[in-house]
Curated annotation (Swiss-Prot):
<feature type="disulfide bond" description="Redox-active">
    <location>
        <begin position="271"/>
        <end position="274"/>
    </location>
</feature>
<keyword id="KW-0676">Redox-active center</keyword>
<dbReference type="InterPro" id="IPR000397">
    <property type="entry name" value="Heat_shock_Hsp33"/>
</dbReference>
<dbReference type="GO" id="GO:0005737">
    <property type="term" value="C:cytoplasm"/>
</dbReference>
<keyword id="KW-1015">Disulfide bond</keyword>
<protein>
    <recommendedName>
        <fullName>33 kDa chaperonin</fullName>
    </recommendedName>
</protein>
<dbReference type="InterPro" id="IPR016154">
    <property type="entry name" value="Heat_shock_Hsp33_C"/>
</dbReference>
<dbReference type="InterPro" id="IPR016153">
    <property type="entry name" value="Heat_shock_Hsp33_N"/>
</dbReference>
<keyword id="KW-0963">Cytoplasm</keyword>
<comment type="similarity">
    <text>Belongs to the HSP33 family.</text>
</comment>
<keyword id="KW-0143">Chaperone</keyword>
<dbReference type="Pfam" id="PF01430">
    <property type="entry name" value="HSP33"/>
</dbReference>
<dbReference type="InterPro" id="IPR023212">
    <property type="entry name" value="Hsp33_helix_hairpin_bin_dom_sf"/>
</dbReference>
<dbReference type="GO" id="GO:0042026">
    <property type="term" value="P:protein refolding"/>
</dbReference>
<dbReference type="GO" id="GO:0044183">
    <property type="term" value="F:protein folding chaperone"/>
</dbReference>
<comment type="function">
    <text>Redox regulated molecular chaperone. Protects both thermally unfolding and oxidatively damaged proteins from irreversible aggregation. Plays an important role in the bacterial defense system toward oxidative stress.</text>
</comment>
<dbReference type="GO" id="GO:0051082">
    <property type="term" value="F:unfolded protein binding"/>
</dbReference>
Length: 293
């Protein structure tokens, strides 16, 4: 078995695993630097940080179930002090997240009080083929419970999600597990209940501080678990000067000139996700205008 002191080897990793004698599949993910990189450029309230961590882990686990190249967006929109929380991840486990806050959010504020009247929207976008979008009612106390209900309703698959956020050794961390009965119909409710009962005993410090192999052994030492190679997880925004230029081209020349005059001849565009600044002076703007068709 892996030594507990080596837990960092599985930081920012996602694992898939199967049970040899039970038709249930599993996933495990832990976000360390990925989560920290997401929070570093924002001063989100603690409750929003925790919610984003929960959504990021859920998105990683969801994208790991994809059988095609593409991405998944998990988005909350509401009329409460948390106007928007959005996470986007792809099949390469590249992920980004952002939130928009308009009002006071206390540390222990509930999901419903943060969001008010709102919905959870999941968008699945294959690189090839049609997009699928599902709208989920936020009628459960947590996003995790709402997503479990989504799996049962949309895919008719029994699914357990265990997601925790917090700190480990003084640093933010978010981690989670997914258990799902196999879609081929060979799994039994009894097998699923047995494994989910064991998974529910997991402690925060185990999710945050153990390598995947050791954690699974502690939970399922009487089972034969086939653990597949890890996939790296990383924060990846995807913004660029080119994309900022394209956004400017959506504005009329007159509006651009007004912005230039107001900001002393320089436009500063900041990425809402990662905080990167893109600057355009008058010369760059004139060159950009000349590219209009």
């Amino acid at each position: 078995m892996t030594n507990q002191q080596d837990y960092t080897q599985d930081n920012d990793k996602l694992y898939r695993y199967l049970f040899q004698h039970r038709a249930v599949r599993g996933e495990w993910v832990r976000l360390n630097k990925t989560f920290t990189d997401t929070l570093n450029t924002h001063q989100y309230p603690k409750a929003v940080q925790d919610l984003l961590g929960e959504m990021m882990v859920a998105t990683n686990l969801l994208t790991a179930t994809l059988k095609f190249a593409g991405n998944i967006t998990v988005q909350i929109q509401g009329d409460g002090p948390l106007r928007l929380a959005l996470v986007n991840g792809n099949d390469q486990q590249q992920i980004r997240a952002l939130a928009r806050v308009d009002g006071n959010i206390t540390e222990n504020m509930s999901l419903h009080n943060m969001i008010g009247k709102g919905v959870l929207v999941i968008t699945i976008a294959p690189k090839e083929g049609e997009r699928y979008q599902g709208v989920i009612s936020l009628d459960k106390p947590t996003i995790t419970e709402c997503l479990e209900d989504y799996f049962v309703r949309s895919e008719q698959l029994q699914t357990q999600l265990i997601i925790r956020t917090g700190e480990y050794e003084g640093k933010p961390v978010a981690a989670g597990m997914l258990l799902q009965i196999m879609p081929d119909g060979s799994g039994t409710p009894e097998d699923f209940e047995h494994l989910t009962t064991l998974a529910a005993t997991v402690k925060d410090e185990e999710l945050f501080g153990l390598p995947a192999e050791e954690l699974l052994y502690r939970l399922y030492h009487e089972e034969t678990v086939n653990l597949y190679p890890a996939q790296d997880v990383q924060f990846f925004c995807g913004c660029s000067a080119e994309r900022s230029s394209s956004a400017l081209l959506l504005i009329s020349d007159e509006e651009i000139d007004e912005i230039l005059a107001e900001h002393k001849g320089r436009i500063d565009m900041q990425c809402e996700c990662c905080g990167t600044h893109y600057f355009f002076n008058k010369e760059a703007i004139e060159k950009l205008k000349s590219t209009r068709v």
